[in-house]
Each structure stands twice: as structure tokens, then as C-alpha cells.
Amino acid sequence: MSNRGDRISSLPDELLCQILSNLPTKNAVTTSILSTRWRSIWLSTPVLDIDIDAFDDATTFVSFASRFLEFSKDSCLHKFKLSVERDDVDMCTIMPWIQDAVNRRIQHLEVDCRFSFHFEAVYLTLYLSETLVSLRLHFVTLHRYEFVSLPNLKVMHLEENIYYCLETLENFISSCPVLEDLTVVRIVDIITEKILRVRSRSLNSLKLVLDSSNGWFIDDIDEWKVIIDAPRLAYLSLKDDQSASFVISNLGSSAKADIKVSFNVNDIWDLPVTFERSNVGKLLTGLSSIRDLTISGTTLMIICHYLKHEPMPQFCNMVRLNARFYDCDLEMLPCVLESCPNLKSLVLGLLSSAETEQQSRVSSVPPCFLSSLEFVEIRSRLCRKRYVMKVARYFAKNSVMLKKFVYVGRVSIQEEDLLALLWRYSICEIEVRGLRR
């Protein structure tokens, strides 16, 4: 063991620093007791990763961080991760640390503040970093500056922040010419601007979250909007129960989307007379070019209401669909599938509604059943066996290209039940699995 320890200690300082860089700074410090050789190695690492919870009090925390930054002030800092969850730390002490990190050509900056108030990022240097590659800010107040330039930023996660005005966030996004990954998490009760615009020619992945689950749901339906124009987008995730309108432009044919929105509808079981159906049409049109779609039961229920009045656009590029359907909307299933003529894979989650199951007939056969649909998975947690078998029978009777049929659920359905339905497809593989809790 000692030989191995000696062998590690004989490595160059640069390599030892690289090894310690993979540890939280507080853990890296513990190596200083190994030997005289290790005593100051941790101070030379290009990473400062500190969490106030790892310290007994705020004074020790501030002293530790200040000592590290002072010792290595002439060297570049590769990564700075700061987690502060107590109000007894003076933000006037913390902000100079961030300014110092930016001045030392930092590449990765993460500030996670959970004060009872928002931490204010007031120094202009943060908005003009030429070296930042990734940036995560949580619970931070961002000021508006006329000029913002982040030429090398590729990953940006902005979570529960306050923006002095709408232009602050828009400028942040538009000032990142090589931005590839963007996450924006907003909370209704701290939002001052209700229209979010994301325009980027470089963006590859976009995740937008707007949460009103804390009870701050606001019924000013026409004001909350999301506008997206990102032609290189490969992945889009929308989790939004507040915005009423979603306008998506130039989405590519290879894109994947995960959609859970409610169009500012507070009760999906009782849509108001004033509900603007055209907002559903706008979202469907914006998504109609994509290849892979996951859609929630809430969103799909509102779409089913829309389809009773308006046609659904064609999703000609769609090959994979993961959708959750309420039993009361079963009659709309063929209508949805008819819009996906080239669908190959369908994962169908069956949900029980608060209403009595309707005795609707599902009889029409979508084109994909006859030409492309090869995989069907039905997932059910609480639905009755009769309902599940009704859906399974629909696919068994009409899907002539089917190669694999999977049932995942708690309803007691045996493989023999499905074999009885699919007996005429000798090449169709059947699988039955229990649903994990």
C-alpha cells in the first residue's frame, strides 16, 4: 500500500492537480494531511467547488474561499461552483469572487444561491466573458446591460432567476453565437415579463419550464406566450402549465420533442367557453415537422377537444410517438394516429379519467397500421382490464406490419391473453411486464 502511495506522490504536480480537480474542494483539502508533498497541492487546482453546508459557519466558509482565491490569483481558474443556502453570507463578499473568477478566464461557472432573497449579479464582467463555456445560475437577479457578449458559451442553465426586464433574458440568449444547450426554469410568482422569446441559430437542445404548482396560477390567458425560432434544434422540452400560446418556427425534421403544456387551462375536465382553440393549432403546426414526440395526458386531452372542431396537421416525418391517453378520449385515438402516416413505434400510456368510461367505438384504420407501424407498447397503471384489452384488440385486428407488442402494467393481463389476439401474426413478438412503482 505504501509503495502505491509513493508511486502516486511521485506524479507531477500538474497531474495531481488534475486528479484533485474531480473532487469537491472540501474533499481535496483532506489530501493535505497525507504528507508534506501534498500539503499545498489542493491550492493549485484550477477548480473551486464549495458548498456552505460543508462548513460550520459563514465566517469559516468565507475565509476558506478567500484563501484559495488569493493563493492562486495569478493562475487561470477552470471551474468555479458555488452553493450557498444560508442568509448569513454577505453577497457583497461573494460577488467579487465571481468577478475574480471571470477575470481569470474561467470556463465553467455555477452559482446556486438559495437565499430568502435573490443574489444580484451586478458586475459587467460576467456579461462580457470571452472564455465561459458553461454557465448555470440559480436564484440570481440579472441586470440589463446594453451590450452583452459571451462568444464561447455553449451551455447555459438559468433557473428561477429574476430579470430586470424582458430584454435581459433575450439579450443573454442572442449574445451567445455558439450556444448549444439552453435551459430556462421560471416560477410564476417571480416573473415580471410574460412573453419568452428564444431565437438562436446555433441552439441544439432547449428546455423551458414554467411552474405554477405552488398555487400562483394566474388566469390572464392572453398574456403568457412562448416564441421559439431555432432551426438547428434537435431536442425541445416544454413543461409549462401557465403559458397560453406557443409559436414554434423552423423546427427541423430530425427533432425530438417532449411536451407537457396546458395552455393556461386550470381545469382540463371543464374547458372554459373562452378557451382559444387556435393556440392548440399553432403548437401542432409548429411541431408537425418533427420525428419523435412525447406528449402528456393533459396536453393530449386538450388536443382531443381541439380535434372535435378542427383537423390535425399531418406529421409526415413522425416515426416515434409516446402519448398518454385518457380513457374518455379513446375515440380520438385513430384521429391522432391518422396524422402520422409513417409512424413506426408507438408507446401508449392509458390513463383513467374522473369520468365514467365512454362506450366509444374505435373502428377506423390509420394508414400507418397498413404500412409502417412495427412496435406497440401499451402502459397502464389503473385502467380496467376490459379497457386495456379493448385497445389491444384494436391494434391486433388492424396492425398488419406489427413485429413486437409489449404490455406494461398492473392490470392482470397474461401473455396468453395477448397471444389469443395476435395469433395470426406468427412473427410478432409478445412481451408482458409489471409496472414499476
Swiss-Prot record:
Residues 5-51 form the F-box domain. LRR repeats lie at residues 86-113, 134-160, 161-186, 187-210, 215-240, 272-297, 322-350. InterPro entries: F-box-like_dom_sf, F-box_AtFBL13-like, F-box_dom, FBD, FBL13/AtMIF1-like, LRR_dom_sf, LRR_FXL15/At3g58940/PEG3-like. Residues 361-406 form the FBD domain. Keywords: Leucine-rich repeat, Repeat. Transmembrane segments: none annotated. This is F-box/FBD/LRR-repeat protein At5g22700. It comes from Arabidopsis thaliana (Mouse-ear cress). The lineage of its organism: Eukaryota, Viridiplantae, Streptophyta, Embryophyta, Tracheophyta.
